[in-house]
């Protein structure tokens, strides 16, 4: 994906960059694969904030993505590469021979007119989907299942991928970009290749207003709050924290404390923890 940079003609344009959308082939999505989606603004079903700094932004229609890739042995043809406002990756519209249309995550190198297929007989080719046990060691994959039939959960954002490094009995070992090495059942599915739009992380929004369009609200420092809002708040002028260590907004130590549950069931399937 190419990045378009702006000249500093205004303060908002200084250092600003956007995607050139050179891979996008249409601006009209498939209407039958759109559903209404109400923004929850970071609230759960009780109305409590569970994710801070969310709210507002432009309205979006949700695109129904095929994460399961369970349409076996039916060839599909790539009709379009489209922008998806709900994720960092682009999506591809697939026309199958039986007449059905589905969206999939667009991997790097996928172009209009290419043919893809799912199933154990599929070739090791970009955008084809197979069980992990049928994919050679060393292959890069994305959209990886953690439970057979549940749909892909790992490596779904722009530029992400995993590499198959070995097999152990009924398990396959993957190397994530973080350096973590988990064991995944060999019957779980994965898609060949890495997600496209890899330059997404280089985008500079330039001004706060563009972040607000995306539904991202300001992040306020704890030291700028009142003491009833944050443990760092209060004091006269620029006061120090006043505690032995930095705290989260909920009063827990913020640095140097491991946050993963020691009794989590998936701990037994992680061979090496992440390194970054």
Curated annotation (Swiss-Prot):
Matching InterPro entries: NA-bd_OB-fold (IPR012340), Rib_uL2_dom2 (IPR014722), Ribosomal_uL2 (IPR002171), Ribosomal_uL2_bac/org-type (IPR005880), Ribosomal_uL2_C (IPR022669), Ribosomal_uL2_CS (IPR022671), Ribosomal_uL2_dom3 (IPR014726), Ribosomal_uL2_RNA-bd_dom (IPR022666)
Matching Pfam families: Ribosomal_L2, Ribosomal_L2_C
Listed PROSITE patterns: RIBOSOMAL_L2 (PS00467)
A cellular-component GO term for this protein: large ribosomal subunit
Compositional bias segments (type: Basic residues): 252-276
Any one Gene Ontology molecular-function term assigned to this protein's record: transferase activity
Stretches the record annotates as Disordered: 221-276
Keywords in alphabetical order: Ribonucleoprotein, Ribosomal protein, RNA-binding, rRNA-binding
Keyword rRNA-binding assigned: yes
Gene Ontology biological-process entries: cytoplasmic translation
Task of the protein: One of the primary rRNA binding proteins. Required for association of the 30S and 50S subunits to form the 70S ribosome, for tRNA binding and peptide bond formation. It has been suggested to have peptidyltransferase activity; this is somewhat controversial. Makes several contacts with the 16S rRNA in the 70S ribosome.
Oligomer and partners: Part of the 50S ribosomal subunit. Forms a bridge to the 30S subunit in the 70S ribosome.
Family: Belongs to the universal ribosomal protein uL2 family.
Name used for this protein in its record: Large ribosomal subunit protein uL2
Species per Swiss-Prot/TrEMBL record: Aster yellows phytoplasma
Recorded name of the encoding gene: rplB
